[in-house]
């Protein structure tokens, strides 16, 4: 289950939760599932007949419908600023991070490339430096309060930090991560190492 969806649901309030099925992702290759999501990918939600797929779309929907005050201060301007960071994370940070996951965790050793790892590390670091500069004078990415914009960035940053790769000093990002850690959803679903790198802890993600 993508952390964006789990964390957003955990943040909507005490009754906000996401059911996580077992047999990891095996249910996606069925006619019933494909009728909801023709891509056969996760996640997909059916909220009273509102069927949605793609993590960021679902997070934005959950925030607007169930927790606008909690997740973007009820402000359309703040929502738009948060959304721009969600989109930016998806296209600017995640491709290089995905390459790191493949070449450090998922591919057989014979298929891993040290050159790809280093190039991807440098690309992520460049984005982190941009993020660190953005946080000057701002507690979070869309302003002074936690929003949906911090969710994908927090997930990606935490995962990169767990890799233990070389990085420059990023004091504002470290303070921002500490602030994210004040949220129980972040502590439960994002901070633990096993949520990102199960092979290093002897566990797997659901």
Set out the residue ranges of the language-model regions.
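GST-like domain detector, emphasizing the conserved glutathione-binding G-site
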Residues: 1-118, 132
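Short, solvent-exposed turn/loop segments enriched in Gly/Ser/Thr/Pro and often Arg
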Residues: 9-11, 148, 193-194
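Short Asp/Glu-rich motifs
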Residues: 14-17, 179, 199-200
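Compositionally biased, intrinsically disordered low-complexity segments enriched
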Residues: 56, 185-186, 191, 198
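GST-like fold's C-terminal all-alpha helical module
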Residues: 73, 86-185, 189
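Acidic/histidine-enriched, glycine/proline-rich intrinsically disordered or flexible terminal extensions
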Residues: 193-206
């Amino acid at each position: 289950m993508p952390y964006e969806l789990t964390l957003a649901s955990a943040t909507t309030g005490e009754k906000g939760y996401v059911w996580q099925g077992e047999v990891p992702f095996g249910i996606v290759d069925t006619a019933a599932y494909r009728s909801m999501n023709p891509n056969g990918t996760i996640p997909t939600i059916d909220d009273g007949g509102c069927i949605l797929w793609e993590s960021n779309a679902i997070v934005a929907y959950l925030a607007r419908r169930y927790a606008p005050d909690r997740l973007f201060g009820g402000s359309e301007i703040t929502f738009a600023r948060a959304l721009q960071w969600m989109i930016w994370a998806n296209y600017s940070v995640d491709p290089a991070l995905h390459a790191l996951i493949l070449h450090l965790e998922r591919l057989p050793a014979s298929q891993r490339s040290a050159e790809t790892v280093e190039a991807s590390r440098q690309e992520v670091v460049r984005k982190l430096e941009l993020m660190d500069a953005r946080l000057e004078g701002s507690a979070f990415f869309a302003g002074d309060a936690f929003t949906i914009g911090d969710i994908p960035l927090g997930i990606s940053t935490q995962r990169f930090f767990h890799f233990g790769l070389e990085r420059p000093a990023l004091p504002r990002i470290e303070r921002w991560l500490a602030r994210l850690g004040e949220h129980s959803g972040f502590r439960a679903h994002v901070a633990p190492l096993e949520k990102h790198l199960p092979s290093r802890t002897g566990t797997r993600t659901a």
